[in-house]
Amino acid sequence: MFIIELIKGIILGVVEGLTEFAPVSSTGHMILVDDMWLKSSEFLGSQSAFTFKIVIQLGSVFAAAWVFRERFLEILHIGKHKHVEGDNDQQRRSKPRRLNLLHVLVGMVPAGILGLLFDDFIEEHLFSVPTVMIGLFVGAIYMIIADKYSAKVKNPQTVDQISYFQAFVIGISQAVAMWPGFSRSGSTISTGVLMKLNHKAASDFTFIMAVPIMLAASGLSLLKHYQDIQIADIPFYILGFLAAFTVGLIAIKTFLHLINKIKLIPFAIYRIVLVIFIAILYFGFGIGKGI
């Protein structure tokens, strides 16, 4: 049984790594895979299972931090200075990168404020299967609208051309995505695209902006609940973290490589299919009624 439970922990880490930064809602997938199927709360206990999810989320966040490590060093003015993307060598030599620490801070402010004010309320009242399905569906529609609009934009901007106003508006959409199932990356990438960034630029800024705020949020949650960690459960935490980190690295790099080509609509369609599947399990078979 111990081996089976370890495998379940690895599976949850893999799911977290695949979905945390993809625009598909990691919350929706964790409800489907864990709460409706694997039920980590049964072999870890409800409190320890909650802490386990914080740990594997940190694995995904560290993966994103590693992928963007050079960007973070540049934003903090550590290491070599690079130049803005441009049409020719002269442009690249003459224009320093515009993305800086203030862009990131401006983008973090709305979600940071709402998180401090409403985090407990959201955790207590909005984490249910129906609310997650609503978030998945509405988020999918928003992504489709963004993609349809982006097709009309002739010269979308790169991440180094982002303005402080654009950063703030994208930050507001990150705050809206606190609704479970909406998806932080789905919301912010869509908003970035609507603000005339290209899909890769919107994704880059989304991940760069998300890393510090998620590190802070997960770190604070871990400090609150670290006493729930049992020595016997440590192997689950380690394997889950490593699975989330490793799979997260691959998923993030693959996503960033493909997003300008495939856009958001395939993810939106997937989300709608996921809503239908969860609805069948929930309303048709009563699975997850206690969540």
UniProtKB/Swiss-Prot annotation:
Q: Which GO terms describe its cellular component?
A: plasma membrane
A single BP term in Gene Ontology: cell wall organization
- Coiled coil regions in record: none
Q: InterPro entries, alphabetically?
A: UppP
Q: Which residues cross the membrane?
A: 1-21, 48-68, 102-122, 126-146, 162-182, 203-223, 231-251, 267-287
Which Pfam families does the entry mention?
BacA
Q: Which top-rank group of organisms is this from?
A: Bacteria
Query: Which UniProt keywords are given for this protein, alphabetically ordered?
Result: Antibiotic resistance, Cell membrane, Cell shape, Cell wall biogenesis/degradation, Hydrolase, Membrane, Peptidoglycan synthesis, Transmembrane, Transmembrane helix
EC number, as in UniProt:
3.6.1.27
Keyword field contains Ion transport: no
Q: Which GO terms describe its molecular function?
A: undecaprenyl-diphosphatase activity
Reaction catalysed by this chain? Answer: di-trans,octa-cis-undecaprenyl diphosphate + H2O = di-trans,octa-cis-undecaprenyl phosphate + phosphate + H(+)
Q: How does it sit in the membrane?
A: Multi-pass membrane protein
Keyword Hydrolase appears in the UniProt entry: yes
Compartmental location: Cell membrane
The kind of enzyme this is, by top-level EC class, is hydrolase
Role summary:
Catalyzes the dephosphorylation of undecaprenyl diphosphate (UPP). Confers resistance to bacitracin.
User: Other notes on this protein?
Assistant: Bacitracin is thought to be involved in the inhibition of peptidoglycan synthesis by sequestering undecaprenyl diphosphate, thereby reducing the pool of lipid carrier available.
What family is reported?
Belongs to the UppP family.
Q: Which NCBIfam families match?
A: PRK00281.1-4, undec_PP_bacA
Name of this chain's protein: Undecaprenyl-diphosphatase
- Gene name, please? uppP
